Each structure stands twice: as structure tokens, then as C-alpha cells.
Amino acid sequence: ITTGATSPKVTGDQLVLSFNDTSNLDADPVHKPANGAFTVLVNGVANAVTNVTVQAQAKTVTLTLTTAVTHGQSVTVAYTDPTTGNDTNAIQNAAGNDVASFAATAVVNNTPAATDTTPPVFSSAAVNGDQLVITYTEANTLDAAALAGSAGFTV
């Protein structure tokens, strides 16, 4: 498994592992580990793998997770070679050598933050001297640029 720029990454329910072996991974779709050979934890809670796909020439293994990861969650992945010796029940290179088991490894979470689709809601209006103060309820910060000048208000 690689580190740095090619370290494990997750976007939504797709977790991609990259390998740096000099040869390609085994391209035979039958020669892949069981879903249970991987342990994925999201914020410390198991997130089961539902599918394993090996991209031989890209030297990647993509895990499909039961539940999509959301922005900001902490993710780790571990792999246990399910059998001893070199066999087709493991991630292998083209020469038939098994990838060694690896302990929990941090995963880069590339899942984008959810977009805010809820508009601000009018709460109240009050006159304070020569100013009209309009209050909105909003989970985030109002966009000050959108409110520059009269911003479409008529008094």
C-alpha cells in the first residue's frame, strides 16, 4: 500500500487503495480477496465492504462501502491476507505474490462538504435609529457580498 500523494483515499462510498509493486496486480476477477478481508472504520465504527474491484494496470483496489463517508469523518482501513502462502484468496501481483496484511492505515477523506440548500428564513425586523435591522435564521453565515447596497430591499 502506498503513502503520501497516493495514500488510501475515500470519496463517498468508494475507498481506493494504491500499490507500488513493479508489476501489475493480478487481473483475474476471480482472484480477489473477500469483502471481509478489509476492516474499514469511520469515526471508529465499522463500515462493511460490499464489493472489491481490482484495477490491475492502475495497481489499485477499490472497496465499495455499505455507507457513504461524509465530509470530515475520520477513516482507517486494514487488510488481512485471509490465508497463509500465496494463493488466489488475496490481493496479488501478476506473479502470484500475495500483498502482505497491513494494520489500520489512515485514509484521506476527499468527500466534499454537503452544499447548503436551505435558504435563510426571515425572523424579525426592527428600527434602530436610522437603521432597519432585519434578522434571518441561518445555519451558516449570510453572504455579505449578496447584501451590498440596497440588495433589492425597498423601504
Regions found by a protein language model. Give the residues of each.
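Non-catalytic beta-sheet/beta-sandwich ligand-binding modules that flank or precede catalytic cores
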Residues: 1-155
